[in-house]
């Protein structure tokens, strides 16, 4: 069953020490963070039902200075246009996922529905 548009798909944590961060989140949540597929990007994440928790090495991606919630969208191009039209900014556009800021400057990510499943 696919996730509906607008649902939370991923919370991403940049880490100075990815191995330590993986141990932390695996221990806290009691789940494994697996290596991502090429389409998911660099790092590790949970692949269980519900929103994923992800970790990547700081300095290896556009969302490196803060934790990011990612939300599912059906069409990422349309979603990025809506972000701009509503006063937000697109920090890192993409076809699979994107990083944006809302009208108040808070960062968030968007993930195309198949990527988020």
What are these regions (language model features)?
Residues 1-23, 50, 66-71, 112-117:
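N-terminal beta-strand motif that seeds the catalytic metal site of vicinal oxygen chelate
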Residues 8-16, 58-86, 96-101, 106:
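Vicinal oxygen chelate
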Residues 17-32, 83:
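Amphipathic alpha-helical segments
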Residues 21, 34, 77, 89-90, ...:
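Ligand-binding pocket scaffold of soluble enzyme catalytic domains
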Residues 30-37, 86-93:
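Short secondary-structure junctions
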Residues 31-66, 107-114:
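Conserved short beta-strand elements that form part of the metal-binding/catalytic scaffold
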Residues 50, 94-95:
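Residue-level signal for tight coil/turn positions that link beta-strands
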């Amino acid at each position: 069953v696919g996730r509906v548009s607008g649902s939370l798909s991923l919370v991403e944590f940049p880490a100075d020490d990815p191995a330590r961060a993986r141990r932390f989140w695996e221990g806290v949540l009691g789940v494994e963070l697996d290596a991502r597929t090429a389409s998911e990007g660099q790092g590790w994440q949970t692949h269980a039902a519900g929103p994923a928790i992800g970790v990547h090495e700081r300095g290896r991606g556009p969302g490196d200075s803060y934790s990011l919630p990612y939300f599912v969208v059906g069409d990422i191009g349309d979603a990025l246009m809506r972000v701009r039209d509503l006063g937000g900014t697109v920090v890192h556009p993409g076809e699979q996922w994107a990083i944006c800021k809302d009208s108040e400057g808070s960062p968030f990510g968007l993930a195309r529905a198949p990527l988020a499943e």
